[in-house]
From Swiss-Prot:
It is an enzyme of class 1 (oxidoreductase). It comes from Burkholderia cenocepacia (strain HI2424). InterPro entries: Flavodoxin/NO_synth, Flavoprotein-like_sf, Flavoprotein_WrbA-like, FMN_Rdtase-like_dom, NQO. Its EC number is 1.6.5.2. Residues 4-191 form the Flavodoxin-like domain. One of its GO terms (molecular function) is FMN binding. NAD(+) binds at Y12. Belongs to the WrbA family. Pfam families: FMN_red (PF03358). This is NAD(P)H dehydrogenase (quinone). Substrate binds at W99.
Amino acid sequence: MAKVLVLYYSSYGHVETMAQHIVEGAKSVPGVEVTLKRVPETIPVDQARAIGVKVDQAAPVATVDELADYDAIIFGTPTRFGNMAGQMRTFLDQTGGLWMKGALVGKIGSVFASTGTQHGGQETTITSFHTTLLHHGMVIVGVPYACSGLVNMSEITGGTPYGATTLAGADGSRQPSANELDIARYQGKHVAELASKLAS
């Protein structure tokens, strides 16, 4: 049985919502075990609450060592100046031991993200994230254009061939759209299908 981990960091809930729909898509594939976890918050709780960070999230916090237990990992992060959030970077910077063992070599790595604006760095966030995954020897999987949501021109929407994305709005008030969530589900299903084939 293939094991898929959806691992995310979410400040205000947008990436958390996307992660839940990626899980939904992955779970639609028979014979795949799907786990949802998040990386630790690095901002002190009192300060995080003061700036509106969603501190209380249902997903348990992951440990670095458990990454080796999965056949595929789908990472989710908000954008910080065109790169992944510091919380995710801090977590990944602790994976040196896994790298030394080659523990993630040959496993699937996939990424989804959120940005504040339409051109706020969603693609650079995902592609720069890929660098770390490639150093670990992971096999990168994105979202193929077989996903019809990628060519939706009827609205302003996230979604790239590199991975699912959502636009949060400059003030965080915009929630993931139906199209963005469809793309997220597609990514989860696509990764789970490939993980199942590789694990068989």
